[in-house]
């Protein structure tokens, strides 16, 4: 039988697996248990009441978190003309068309998000086998194929998170870093949950957000009491 590490023993002692924690209590617990030698991310898993086998019940989109994710995001933009200048002014790290495509083909992909204007998709479309498996292919559903590339760049830089349910109907994404204060993490999580509720498929029946749990990069998941979150949609 594998020997438990000191870290895992500590987690087992502190985390009650059947308990739904108040958000502030949960964040305090994650901070206490985050002992890695780097600043861990705070990740969230949201179990949705959908049938992921049905295409009309899949949930996909993007939202800007009010306090960002704590990451420096590098953005590559496929566009030309006036849009290229607008993208650069908005803070894009790489801007181009065929020249940028050549870098991608060579494996030089020093970026986290790819944005494209509609007229550039003839170039980007040829890169699907490279960008697709890495989750980098631009898509209008998450706002990365758009005529307004400058806004897309600003959103990405401001801490936009993209979300998509997996085959089990669960959304996995990040809501910040463990060194964020509790209020920032709470507001980021609430913003994400509001966005998810607005994206609820019309064909999904019953309780939509079934379970919410948060964890750090190296830590265990902590289930949340949703009553301690303000996720009312207008």
From Swiss-Prot:
Give the residues annotated as coiled coil.
none
Q: Name one GO biological process term.
A: translation
What UniProt keywords are attached to this protein's entry? Repressor, Ribonucleoprotein, Ribosomal protein, RNA-binding, rRNA-binding, Translation regulation, tRNA-binding
The answer, when asked if Repressor is one of the entry's keywords, is yes
Q: Name one GO molecular function term.
A: tRNA binding
Q: Which domain of life is it from?
A: Bacteria
PROSITE patterns from the xrefs?
RIBOSOMAL_L1
One Pfam family named in its UniProt record: Ribosomal_L1
Q: Does the keyword Ribosomal protein apply?
A: yes
Cellular component terms per the entry's GO annotation: cytosolic large ribosomal subunit
Per the record, the similarity remark reads: Belongs to the universal ribosomal protein uL1 family.
Function comment: Binds directly to 23S rRNA. The L1 stalk is quite mobile in the ribosome, and is involved in E site tRNA release. Protein L1 is also a translational repressor protein, it controls the translation of the L11 operon by binding to its mRNA.
* Assembly and oligomerization: Part of the 50S ribosomal subunit.
Identification of the protein by name: Large ribosomal subunit protein uL1
Q: Which organism is it from?
A: Aliivibrio fischeri (strain MJ11)
The coding gene here is: rplA
């Amino acid at each position: 039988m594998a020997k438990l590490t000191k870290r895992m023993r500590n987690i087992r002692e502190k985390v009650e697996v059947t308990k739904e924690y108040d958000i502030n209590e949960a964040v305090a617990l994650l901070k206490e248990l985050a002992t890695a030698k780097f600043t861990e991310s705070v990740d969230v898993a949201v179990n949705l009441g959908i049938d992921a086998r049905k295409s009309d019940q899949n949930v996909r989109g993007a939202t800007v978190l009010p306090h960002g994710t704590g990451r420096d995001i590098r953005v590559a933009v496929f566009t030309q003309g006036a849009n290229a200048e607008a993208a650069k002014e908005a803070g894009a790290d790489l801007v181009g068309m065929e020249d940028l495509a050549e870098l991608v083909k060579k494996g030089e992909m020093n970026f986290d998000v790819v944005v494209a204007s509609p007229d550039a998709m003839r170039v980007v479309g040829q890169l699907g086998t490279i960008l697709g498996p890495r989750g980098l292919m631009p898509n209008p559903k998450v706002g990365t194929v758009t005529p307004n590339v400058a806004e897309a760049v600003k959103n990405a830089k401001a801490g936009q998170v993209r979300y998509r349910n997996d085959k089990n109907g669960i959304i996995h994404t990040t809501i910040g870093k463990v060194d964020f204060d509790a209020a920032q993490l709470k507001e980021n999580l609430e913003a994400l949950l509001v966005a998810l509720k607005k994206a609820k498929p019309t064909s999904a029946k019953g309780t939509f957000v079934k379970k919410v749990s948060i964890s750090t990069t190296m830590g265990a998941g902590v289930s949340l009491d949703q009553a301690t979150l303000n996720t009312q949609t207008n």
